[in-house]
Amino acid sequence: MKSPAPSRPQKMALIPACIFLCFAALSVQAEETPVTPQPPDILLGPLFNDVQNAKLFPDQKTFADAVPNSDPLMILADYRMQQNQSGFDLRHFVNVNFTLPKEGEKYVPPEGQSLREHIDGLWPVLTRSTENTEKWDSLLPLPEPYVVPGGRFREVYYWDSYFTMLGLAESGHWDKVADMVANFAHEIDTYGHIPNGNRSYYLSRSQPPFFALMVELLAQHEGDAALKQYLPQMQKEYAYWMDGVENLQAGQQEKRVVKLQDGTLLNRYWDDRDTPRPESWVEDIATAKSNPNRPATEIYRDLRSAAASGWDFSSRWMDNPQQLNTLRTTSIVPVDLNSLMFKMEKILARASKAAGDNAMANQYETLANARQKGIEKYLWNDQQGWYADYDLKSHKVRNQLTAAALFPLYVNAAAKDRANKMATATKTHLLQPGGLNTTSVKSGQQWDAPNGWAPLQWVATEGLQNYGQKEVAMDISWHFLTNVQHTYDREKKLVEKYDVSTTGTGGGGGEYPLQDGFGWTNGVTLKMLDLICPKEQPCDNVPATRPTVKSATTQPSTKEAQPTP
């Protein structure tokens, strides 16, 4: 039996989707949001804190994923009675009262597989099904099967999934693509948004909003029917990201929305909670304690919001790249997020038109145009010649170049002259022997140099191609694929991230060991293999020599930068 759709009708506040410009109200009906499952740190209170602080497990995620064997209130009561007794053994207490997550079986691929064969063979290995879960499980049920990243990640993750789905589509698994879109739509209907992952402790935040792009991907196979089917969920997700906008005054922020002094509306990353993350409890407490000059709750919120960005962690969010406790994610307006919001507005316009609602389509187009102007005005650093994040504290665009700067090109929001400058900056500052650097800063954090990540390689490749910069796009794909191939030849696996300063080495840094699998690397690798090799002669491994760039398949943009006041 598949888990049913939410049984109680949801009621969601009417969304003034075009209030930003025309102050006309748009009503979107949703159903009444059910009771939100409580995360383990709330369910277990002091017991959760004590277990995590005791470091019973090498990975803090282990206990966050453990399932209570009975009512957590009863377990907590027993703990309070027993904890001060002579000979009390906390590890034994945990073993008796909780079911710990099982280690996944080690997958041993068949000998002699090509890179493509290896990836195609991994899809069933990484597929999970959780139509039903235990009552106190932190895992949230989903109606359809889904593909997980791999390694310690035993659940589905929001933005990872889009790049995984690109690979599923490339392999012809459109049924799995449709299943995953249906799952994310189910989460929007059930919780009002797509959480970071399908765990109760991820519900307080989302991740980079790729749902509309997932629907657009599915529409490549199913046509406009997919756009019309999921239009209500896309509208609900948009409402989540814009929640609170109707009450904002110039210069204010509310949750995920920012209203600048001139009335420009942009978005930021935000987590609704300001406590340590259950899956990184001890690390977050240590980070907060290391900076007594800031309230711990402020640091916790910024750590959580960085997790919402997908870039956890990066010098991009920090004042001092060597000190994580200086991060201030919530006071930064990210260029990648606002590019994705622009794309969401464009797809909403397209879906509304497909559904026969031209008036609503025009309103979404108006919103997209306004956001595009905001991106060009606030998220372009004219002095440096690249897109960058905007700093709400200094009221200036930041100077740091990161791979996120390619997102305006990826969503076709960039002016052509600026896209050309981005191509130069990318080749000069970010391109390395093993692919695209995330940043040029070595901080020890995993979203910094020398690490390169598959989704950013694809965003850059596709974005540069959109503007006719095919040589740089080919360089990125070729360098990254060579890295993936060399690592695979040696270790017979694909990994989460790569050291791009060389080829054949997995990346380092971060809060946990390097993970293999790996969903989004698999997806991007397949897309790139099919990009560099002609369709009439597809390649199963990376060719020995760099292919030449053929005639453009994508029309470059003809937009020029508009002067900003």
Swiss-Prot record:
Signal sequence annotation: 1-30
InterPro entries in the record: 6-hairpin_glycosidase_sf (IPR008928), 6hp_glycosidase-like_sf (IPR012341), Glyco_hydro_37 (IPR001661), Glyco_hydro_37_CS (IPR018232), Trehalase_periplasmic (IPR023720)
Amino acid composition bias (Polar residues), ranges on this chain: 548-565
The keyword Mitochondrion belongs to this UniProt entry's keyword annotation: no
Family the UniProt entry places it in: Belongs to the glycosyl hydrolase 37 family.
GO molecular function, one term: alpha,alpha-trehalase activity
Catalysed reactions, as listed in the record: alpha,alpha-trehalose + H2O = alpha-D-glucose + beta-D-glucose
Single GO biological process annotation from the record: cellular hyperosmotic response
Keywords linked to the UniProt accession: Glycosidase, Hydrolase, Periplasm, Signal
Induction field: By growth at high osmolarity, is regulated by cAMP.
Protein name: Periplasmic trehalase
Catalytic-site annotation from UniProt: 312 (proton donor/acceptor), 496 (proton donor/acceptor)
EC number of the protein: 3.2.1.28
Function in brief: Provides the cells with the ability to utilize trehalose at high osmolarity by splitting it into glucose molecules that can subsequently be taken up by the phosphotransferase-mediated uptake system.
Organism name: Escherichia coli (strain K12)
Main location per the UniProt record: periplasm
